[in-house]
Amino acid sequence: MEVSVDISLYPLADEFIPAINEFIERVQQYPSIAVVRNDFSTQLFGDYEQIMELLKIEIKLSWEQYGKSILVVKFLG
């Protein structure tokens, strides 16, 4: 099943830009997932199972590296 996901990451830290950029750079490393960046969010397009696994890994890593953040995720399936 194909899905579209719209993600907005709001790190709760003074230095928030590195956390956002690193998250985007990591999700761009998944060859089967299309990634579109814009000013307010990042959009992912691809297989539901692959995107859910990607999110599980990358959200955890982001929180471990940069601490608390607000993450808004919208799914279109």
Annotated model-derived regions:
Residues 1-77:
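Charge-rich, low-complexity N-terminal segments
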